Amino acid sequence: MRLSRYFLPILKENPKEAEIVSHRLMLRAGMIRQQSAGIYSWLPLGKRVLDKVNKIIREEQNRAGAIELLMPTLQTAELWQESGRYDDYGKEMLRIKDRQDRQMLYGPTNEEMITDIFRSYVKSYKNLPLNLYHIQLKFRDEVRPRFGTMRSREFLMKDAYSFDLTKEDAIHSYNKMFVAYLRTFERLGLRAIPMRADTGPIGGNHSHEFIILADTGESEVFCHKSFLDRAIPAESTDFDDVAALQGVFDEWTADYAATSEMHDDAAYDAIPEGERLSARGIEVGHIFYFGTKYSEPMGAKVQGKDGKEHPVHMGSYGIGPTRLVPAIIEASHDENGIIWPASVAPFDVVIINMKAGDAACDAACEKLYYQLSNAGKDVLYDDTDDRAGQKFATADLIGVPVQIIVGPRSVANGEVEVKDRKTGERETVTIEAAMNKALG
């Protein structure tokens, strides 16, 4: 992508409305634009990052055996009345009427709708286990939306729903998602710590939040330091191995970890003093096992091996991609801007032409641009006639991992400069060597 033809509305000044680093940087880098309180447009740079986050989420959901579908944002009030939850959400739920005067709502979550889909088609235990997920916009009318897309009213959510014949089977499905979440956050460049959680209006009696540590986090967290360097389950993990997944779950929940809402002073004090960690954290995922809370009232039953009908045991598993993007920024930035993990960076490499219009510089940049693009890399080519300082500031602000700086003097020697955005290290190398570095 040539920067001269790209839509990248950079802000030179810090927006006054931004309270935290991620909100400030997302606005300055031209990733998002606020349309109204808690509602944002995702501009091209932000959309590229969001798409890469969603791609990783999808890959790990699919690896764990979940199947993607897509449910609508608008739901009928009847389903929520059937489950008994219609009044639980209060003013958070946006309620509307269509032209036929039917009560509708903008879905804050999808337990009722997915249960309705399940009961319409699945009648036998032979079709279980089943895990269905989608990535869709949700709306919750927050009293005080803040922090940009970290706590917005409209947001994108990946929610998965598992269906099993027995509680034991449902716990295995829960453990699958537990492991999938650990892997997802690791691939996003985050260390997420699972913590026992309150189930809230979703319901159930078994729930974990996944929290990343960040100074701007809304939650106070207490945990054992061992979580910071614990090994993440490998890509080769067998998700059908019940004992192995239970082992992973047991390992990750054996040491103390809790938010302030669930904090136990005595349990925390039992940790050796040098191993205690108290910090702020951001919730990036939440999983629930709620048994038959929805299947019982909504008649989601299957015929068991005994020939009798049984309500299915369900779980719900949420990740907010539009919340994850600022969470990644909170965990990875410096005074100059964003430092994206390579897995979600909007571009893999930025080529900075220090003298656009110079024949040698243009030729070297074009060669790098086409060869890296043809090799499958996402390349941003700064071919503008902006000043050098502005080009460097833009590259640092948007956080592209590798910068290739092409100037007349170095090109005359067949060389360019390569900068690592994360470390700040620079080195002068041949054009061919720069190509190899960018290719990884």
Curated annotation (Swiss-Prot):
- The cysteines joined by S-S bonds are none
InterPro entries (alphabetical): aa-tRNA-synt_IIb (IPR002314), aa-tRNA-synth_II (IPR006195), aa-tRNA-synth_II/BPL/LPL (IPR045864), Anticodon-bd (IPR004154), Anticodon-bd_dom_sf (IPR036621), Pro-tRNA-ligase_IIa (IPR002316), Pro-tRNA-synth_IIa_bac-type (IPR004500), Pro-tRNA_synthetase (IPR050062)
Q: Name one GO molecular function term.
A: ATP binding
What's a single GO CC term here? cytosol
Task: Give a single Pfam family match.
Answer: tRNA-synt_2b
An example GO biological process term is: prolyl-tRNA aminoacylation
In which domain of life is the source organism classified? Answer: Bacteria
Its subcellular locations are: Cytoplasm
Q: What is its EC number?
A: 6.1.1.15
| EC class name | ligase
Keywords from the UniProt entry: Aminoacyl-tRNA synthetase, ATP-binding, Cytoplasm, Ligase, Nucleotide-binding, Protein biosynthesis
CDD domains from the xrefs? ProRS_anticodon_short, ProRS_core_prok
User: Does the UniProt entry include the keyword ATP-binding?
Assistant: yes
Question: Which chemical reaction does it catalyze?
Answer: tRNA(Pro) + L-proline + ATP = L-prolyl-tRNA(Pro) + AMP + diphosphate
User: What function is annotated for this protein?
Assistant: Catalyzes the attachment of proline to tRNA(Pro) in a two-step reaction: proline is first activated by ATP to form Pro-AMP and then transferred to the acceptor end of tRNA(Pro).
**Which family, according to the similarity comment?**
Belongs to the class-II aminoacyl-tRNA synthetase family. ProS type 2 subfamily.
Listed under subunit, the entry gives:
Homodimer.
What's this protein's name?
Proline--tRNA ligase
